[in-house]
Amino acid sequence: MGIRSLTRIEAERRSALVTVERYDVDIDLTALPNGPEIRCVSTVTFTCSEPGAETFVDCAAEVRSATLNGTALTPGDDGRIPLPGLAARNVLRVESLQADTTTSPGAHKAVDPADGEVYLWTSFEPDEARFVWACFDQPDLKAPHAFTVTAPAAWTVLSNSGDPRVEEQGAARRWSFPDTPPLSVYNTVVNAGPFHEIRREAGGHDLGVFARRSLAEVLERDADEIFTLTGQGLAFFAEAFAMPFPQRKYDQVFMPEFGGAMENYGCVTWSDMFLRRATPTHAERELLAVVLLHEMAHMWFGNIVTMRWWDDLWLNEAFAEFACHWAAEGATRYTDVWAGHLAGGKLRAYLSDQGPVSHPIHQPIHDVAQAASIFDSITYPKGASVLQQLMTYVGEDRFRTGMAAYFARHAWGTTTLQDLIDALAEAGDRDLATWRKAWLETAGTDRFTLEHDGSTVILVADGTPRPQVLAVGAYDRTGDALERAALVRVEVSEPRTPVTGLPATSDLLLINDDDLTFATTRPDPAGRDTLFRVAARLPTAISRGVAVATVWDMLTAGEATAAEAGRCLTAVLAAETSDAVIEPFLTLVTNIAELWAPDADRPALTEAVAGVCLQLADDPGRRQVALRGLARTATAEGLARLRDQADDDVDLRWRALVREAELGGDVTAESAALLERDPDPDAWVRALTVRAAVPDPAAKAETWQRLAVDRTVPVQSVGAVAAAFWRPGQDALLAPYAERYLAEIPRLDQGGMIPAMVYTSQLFPPYAIDSAYVERAQQAVQEAAPVVRNTLLERSDTVRRMLRARAVNA
């Protein structure tokens, strides 16, 4: 029958019937060093509001035995165990076995190639706990959880509540954790392995960071910064939400073969790729800060107060994404973080919101499978931008007051959208009903331009705009720079809005200056070429970012060429002063050269990017970022210079080898030698990335087998290997793999939500295809799992836009 996805109707019925008193979960990990198995005994104590009724518990692991109030149960073949004849108070006991900890969702066994040590992580969002132990796997059935874990004696076991009682049992130890506060099942966690551990005190909290032993040196390097950011974040959110984090212990665990990061209460799990093997760049450090604060914000948005159902996923993710930037700007050294957000996530969101899978931030969700498909750029960066706009709309002080009231009112419970809107409306003294409908329940992006009506400037919307506040900046040329002569904020609710207070004449008028709202913009027709020409002369990272966002949106909409956009971006890079945006802008312009430019224009644009990299490399603070960019764009002659600059930098040498391999150089011996001396336990992935770039049939076949078929590449490295595999100018070699991608579609959802998203998007071919292929792919995915379908539709729409741009002459 297959594993069924929980529907909203089923969840509402079960929630009305069942109140969970507690979970007692006994987990046995002792088989993992030599095998794949996890054994669990889940005891669920719950009450029933209608004695005699029936329901079901979720368990997609192998059920060894199940009893309800002492009576044996028969599991179904759909990932559920029927629970007939419920009593007023019930005790359910289920013994289960998870025999696949390699590809199954929920729990994963990773073996460190450096020393053979084994590590185990769990990750349960949105409904993957059921693959490990029996539970009511829906967010509104919150309850205390008590975990007892038996593990090899050399291992440390970590869970939500910290401070376990540890008992020696010969070759094993038994870890008994105190009860958690009431949590949704998906917020719980067990991580285990022979960790390297570092602890600090900060603000009354006991902070811990953990990593596999082979990364101990890297963890020690980054520990001070991680602890500093953690202390800053806990203090900021405690004040902003008028509620300190209520648990003394706060752990962060960096795990191998983990995708992204997960906000488990009191015990955040990270991909250990965030522990950069090379010295981190500014953008990489800023990303670490943003992700750290994002997961921390979830302690309040998601853990302490939880969405009732997945249609309010944005209550978790959009708020966490907004709050992490808010906190980073207000409490850490990353004060240009909103500029980084604009240069990265917000640009992706603009593109996604104008594509085939655009959806309202808040929308009806039929079942959890559909919910897995909206962990996307609409929910995250668009949602964060909309909330930034809301704070501007109601005022930051009133926004804080509303947040404090929301948490005081709903702590340890579940909420809906209306609960939050009510709290903010009361605090802000604004009717937010219209705002809610326009921003949260309506898909799409507003677009603004300007008209001059005699002496008046009119802000013109493409249709009826959402209620919002935005700004128009007026700039005049002073020497080689532009200086802001005026900034006028306007509250918009009509298609045409007069903008008063601007100078009679200006060299440039910039719509959405200060980036206060989520909207695309267009210069007036007379100012189009001026914007492209003078964007680099704007005085701040945000103003330059707003100009770049306009140029990018025009490229993706077919209103600007790749050559125009590339010239504008390289000029901005040459003048940029903010480290927060140099790396994302460099990535963006390199992608334009590789993926958007016609074949005839690509060499010149690539050479221009390489030239700005060489210019940036003269600044010692930007040398590393610039040389990484050069490694993507250098010609054979440029690679020689890069080698001289790289010295003993192993990371740069790997990057140079990838480029040299793509250009046809014989790098086999050098790659093998570098692999021998690279201390990174995952260096074999770097060697495979070099192999992936080689324009040779055997190299492509080997890479595809390991990447797409065997899936031996850690999920967090799939993107890098796939990018080296799909290279411009290799169409004849790559064409067969475009067809093989289509054949892989039925199994792209294997392993859970994160692998499904990664494999679907990163393996989609950007080369060796045409628009007819895009249509075939979109048809082929219609019956796939929702997360695969939506990810493919979004990625294929972007590639379709690339194909259109490549067909346009400069």
Question: Predicted segment positions?
Answer:
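Hydrophobic alpha-helical and helix-loop surface patches within well-folded domains
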Residues: 177, 209-464, 591-592, 607-608, ...
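Charged, low-complexity, helix-prone segments enriched in Lys/Glu/Asp/Gln
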Residues: 14-27, 144-145, 223, 327, ...
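Charge-dense, low-complexity polyampholytic segments
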Residues: 61, 338-339, 705-710
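Extended hydrophobic/aromatic-rich secondary-structure runs
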Residues: 97-100, 112-120, 125-127, 142, ...
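Non-catalytic accessory/interaction domains
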Residues: 67-68, 148-151, 213, 297, ...
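Acidic/His-enriched low-complexity segments
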Residues: 1-248, 349-353, 375-381, 392-397, ...
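Hydrophobic pocket-lining residues within nucleotide cofactor-binding pockets
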Residues: 182, 274-275, 692
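Short, glycine- and charge-enriched coil/turn segments that flank and shape catalytic ligand pockets
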Residues: 50-52, 87, 165-172, 203, ...
